[in-house]
Amino acid sequence: MGLNRRQFLIGSGALGGLSAVSWLHSLLPQKTVLAPAVADPSISLPIQPEPIAIAPKGLTAPGRGDVRIVVISDLNSQYGSTTYDPEVTQAIALIPDWQPDLVLCGGDMVAGQKTSLTDAQIQAMWQGFDQQIAAPLRRAKIPFGFTIGNHDGSGAIAQGKMRFQRDRDQASRYWNNPQHDPGLKFIDKAGFPFNYTFSQKGIFYLVWDASTDRIPENQLAWVEKSLASSTAQSAKMRIAIGHLPLYAVAVGRNTSGNVLSNPDPLRNLLEKYQVHTYISGHHHAYFPGKRGQLELLHTGALGGGPRQLLNSQLSPTKTLTVIDVNLNSESTLYTTYNMKDLSVIQTKSLPRIIVGVNGWVLRRDLTWEELPPQEQKI
């Protein structure tokens, strides 16, 4: 949405911020050194079959990985809206033809975070979401993982209380209704739908509540315990999902309150437990980035208000991303579609590096040494 929401986000971290900072800075990433594998020339390795290219008819078809994930985000329209932009409707209709194992949503499924909305209006928004998005995916038997966005159930605190408690109550009521089962294999759903873990096809997924700029200390302790668990560490890959990104990438979002506070300690926490990718929304701009050992998928908006990338003259674009995962190499391939004409966005057309209010993000296909000297001077 292109409406003014910054004031709702900035005040969210009044409680627990300082203790979370000191707790986070005690975390250091752990590096694992592996001995290089030596191939035995006497062993004949099987020929790997070419990946099967799968996509809706007429679209560029990527080769399918061991696991395929369709990633969407920021679906909503204006405050209180119960309908969705045509690109959202089109995407939901196309998704089954990509044959994904999972759909992930980076948040903002409905258009709340306005105190004047009544309970009936909030319920109507979730009903509209169910009819137009969740139910079609359930009928297609495609599991749906998601993170709560600030417009779904903001955790903003004012005068010691949740400012949007009604939004959070309605979100919880909707998602804990057995009729709205998202089809996930939960590991820990005690905090569902705000923070939870699940697994699928060898990948461990952790969802934290990044509906505001600060993640509470008790939730960070839960994050570390979850990632340190034998279930997480025995998985072939680990992916984390939250609404706000670690670092800014978009015009109009390059301010405190629109990114997670203390991004480097948070990144260190994820790196410590070998999380491969952090998927976020909120900035309404697609950027496939990385920082340190962590890949950062900034998911573009599918609904209202796409935004321009920082350090770029590219036009704002509504997007959908298909991730194909190779579990053996622990690598991912992104195919991101411009939902205006369904063309594929070329990674090399995006900025090499984005420098925002709280740090920089490198495009994930590059190394620091490949940047021009002037871009290394940040």
Description of each model-found segment:
Residues 1-3:
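Secretory targeting signals
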Residues 7-29:
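N-terminal export signals
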Residues 29-123:
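N-terminal active-site segment of His-dependent metallophosphoesterases
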Residues 36-61, 117-236, 262-274, 291-300, ...:
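Extended active-site neighborhood of metal-dependent phosphoesterases/phosphodiesterases
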Residues 40, 291-377:
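Binuclear metal-dependent phosphoesterase catalytic core
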Residues 72-73, 103-107, 144-149, 208, ...:
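Active-site neighborhood of phospho(di)ester-bond hydrolases with catalytic His/Asp-centered motifs
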Residues 75-78, 109-113, 150-154, 211-214, ...:
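Solvent-exposed loop/turn segments at secondary-structure junctions
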Residues 233-250:
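Short acidic, glycine-rich surface-loop motifs adjacent to enzyme active sites
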